Amino acid sequence: MPSPDKEMDKVLLIGLGGFLGAVCRFLICEHVDGQLGILSVNVLGSFMLGMIMYDAEYLSFIGPKGRLAFGTGFIGAFTTFSTFAVQSFSMAFLPALGNISANLFLTLTGVFFGRSFIKALSSREI
């Protein structure tokens, strides 16, 4: 069983990352309104998570603590599936369908390009 101190360190890393991620999302959404703001943070967050995913699998440049702080904390608070869902639910059918399609396609594309970007920088294969 992990010691309470080590668990608290993890909680603090996630909390610090989450604080920074939430502030960054707020700042972006203050300047990019509505669905485009949420789409922007979700796509950017997916791109960053794709980079972390590739790094964790092949490179280990970012250690476990960095992945907790940045992946779980920062990106977890930076992106927002719930706001995307509420926005989509409150729209008429066709605009909602477009919003859902754009979010799914672009966030998956973001993960792909994040992985590809780190792969190109590291010259390793996926």
Swiss-Prot record:
Keywords, ordered alphabetically: Cell membrane, Ion channel, Ion transport, Membrane, Metal-binding, Sodium, Transmembrane, Transmembrane helix, Transport
Identify its membrane topology class.
Multi-pass membrane protein
Would I find Ion transport among this entry's keywords? yes
Q: Where in the cell is it found?
A: Cell membrane
Q: Please provide the Gene Ontology terms (biological process) for this protein.
A: cellular detoxification of fluoride
Q: Where does the chain cross the membrane?
A: 11-31, 36-56, 69-89, 93-113
Q: Name one GO cellular component term.
A: plasma membrane
A Pfam family assignment? CRCB
Recorded superkingdom? Archaea
Q: Which InterPro entries match?
A: FluC
Q: Which reaction does it catalyse?
A: fluoride(in) = fluoride(out)
Binding of Na(+), residues: G76, T79
Q: Does the keyword Plastid apply?
A: no
Q: Give the regulation of activity.
A: Na(+) is not transported, but it plays an essential structural role and its presence is essential for fluoride channel function.
Which molecular function terms from Gene Ontology are attached? fluoride channel activity; metal ion binding
User: Tell me, what does this protein do in biology?
Assistant: Fluoride-specific ion channel. Important for reducing fluoride concentration in the cell, thus reducing its toxicity.
Q: Record's family? A: Belongs to the fluoride channel Fluc/FEX (TC 1.A.43) family.
Q: What is this protein called?
A: Fluoride-specific ion channel FluC 2
Which gene holds the coding sequence for this protein? fluC2
